[in-house]
């Protein structure tokens, strides 16, 4: 089955057969009533926002793959709100003007960095003193616990692994990204890269082959690439302690 995301009238029509915003809203409101108290976990929070059907079909499996935990073990505050559109607008973003840089983001960043010194394969924390001496203000974008040598303990992160494959076919899935929201499929989504630039080469010709990447979410351990932090109360409290240490930094 294929559903349109974010949740919109195409989604609700496929799931329930409803054809008007009033019908869709009534269906969601009916199912939201299942939760009668303050949500205590992510499952209850999601159902209180969009109902049982959408939760089971499009949220539960994907979320559990993403976090590696049962939704009932995840805190409710992870989901503040779930966008629901009672229109047939299935665009992911709401911005009036949307686009992708011609040639991709790598080319755009290369242009931005033209004339700026860039050092590759250089570990900041291993060369901190020398690198700090180069500027009056330093912007560090790595893990905050690593910055302080894990002095207070290690924050929990999730990592992501990609399997990329070149296929001898012109069109694999007809879309740049397809999420797999069931729990059984091991990957969270498949990216078909050519559709980010509309499947054409630099001269505007169709490309006869395609490249796909399967994305897998996994537990993180030291040495892995941390993609996003585990957002729960324990890690939030530890982060707050590290943040206080960071506020005392002079540079």
What does each model-found stretch correspond to?
Residues 247-251:
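Short FAD-binding loop at a beta-strand-to-alpha-helix junction that anchors the flavin cofactor
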Residues 2-6, 10-137, 141-148:
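Active-site/ligand-binding neighborhood in enzyme catalytic cores
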Residues 1, 125-245:
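Mid-domain catalytic core of redox enzymes
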């Amino acid at each position: 089955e294929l559903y349109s995301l974010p949740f919109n009238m195409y989604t609700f029509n496929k799931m329930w057969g409803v054809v008007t915003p009033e019908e869709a809203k009534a269906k969601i409101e009916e199912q939201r009533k299942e939760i009668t108290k303050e949500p205590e976990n992510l499952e209850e929070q999601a159902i209180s926002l969009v109902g049982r059907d959408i939760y089971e079909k499009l949220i539960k499996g994907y979320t559990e793959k993403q976090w590696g935990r049962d939704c009932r073990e995840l805190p409710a505050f992870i989901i503040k709100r779930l966008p629901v559109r009672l229109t047939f607008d299935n665009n992911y973003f709401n911005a009036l003007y949307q686009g992708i840089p011609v040639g991709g983001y790598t080319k755009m960043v290369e242009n931005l960095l033209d004339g700026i010194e860039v050092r590759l394969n250089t570990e900041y924390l291993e060369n901190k003193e020398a690198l700090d001496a180069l500027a009056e203000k330093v912007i560090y974008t790595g893990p905050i616990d690593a910055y302080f040598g894990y002095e207070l303990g290690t924050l929990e992160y999730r990592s992501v692994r990609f399997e990329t494959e070149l296929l001898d076919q012109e069109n694999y899935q007809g879309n740049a990204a397809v999420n797999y929201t069931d729990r059984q499929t091991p990957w969270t989504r498949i990216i078909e890269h050519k559709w980010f630039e509309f499947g054409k080469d630099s001269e505007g010709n169709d490309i006869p082959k395609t490249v796909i990447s399967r994305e897998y979410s996994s537990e993180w351990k030291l040495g892995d690439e941390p993609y996003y932090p585990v957002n729960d109360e324990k890690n939030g409290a530890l982060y707050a302690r590290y943040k206080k240490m960071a506020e005392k930094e002079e540079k």
